[in-house]
UniProtKB/Swiss-Prot annotation:
Keywords: Coiled coil, Cytoplasm. PANTHER family: UPF0265 PROTEIN YEEX. InterPro entries: DUF496, UPF0265. Residues 21-41, 69-103 form a coiled coil. This is Pole-localizer protein TmaR. It holds the Pfam family DUF496. Pole-localizer protein involved in the regulation of several cellular processes. One of its GO terms (cellular component) is cytosol. Belongs to the pole-localizer TmaR family. It is found in: Cytoplasm. It comes from Sodalis glossinidius (strain morsitans).
Amino acid sequence: MDHIKPSFHDVLEFVRMFRRKNKLQREIADNEKRIRDNQKRVLLLDNLSDYIKSGMSIEEIQAIISNMRTDYEDRVDDYIIKNAELSKERRELSKKLKAIGEVKALNSVIDKQP
């Protein structure tokens, strides 16, 4: 009976380590996203400072900001459309893979029959 306990303990340790690894991967991905977001903010401010010149009126600055906003909104829309297309392709592939798996499972059942 003693040999079962260490084995069970090993399984629990494996599960704990696997969960920790997954959590670390999620945290790394979150941090990478935050880094990208902040780098984009810095770039946005750099771009804005390139367009704004001394002596510009508030209306001119607001027009620049409005144009930049429109450009970014258009990009977001483009990415949403692209993401939808990719998701559709992924779903189609999942269906095909599932069908292939079902055919293989059926064939293995048929092959095992006497």
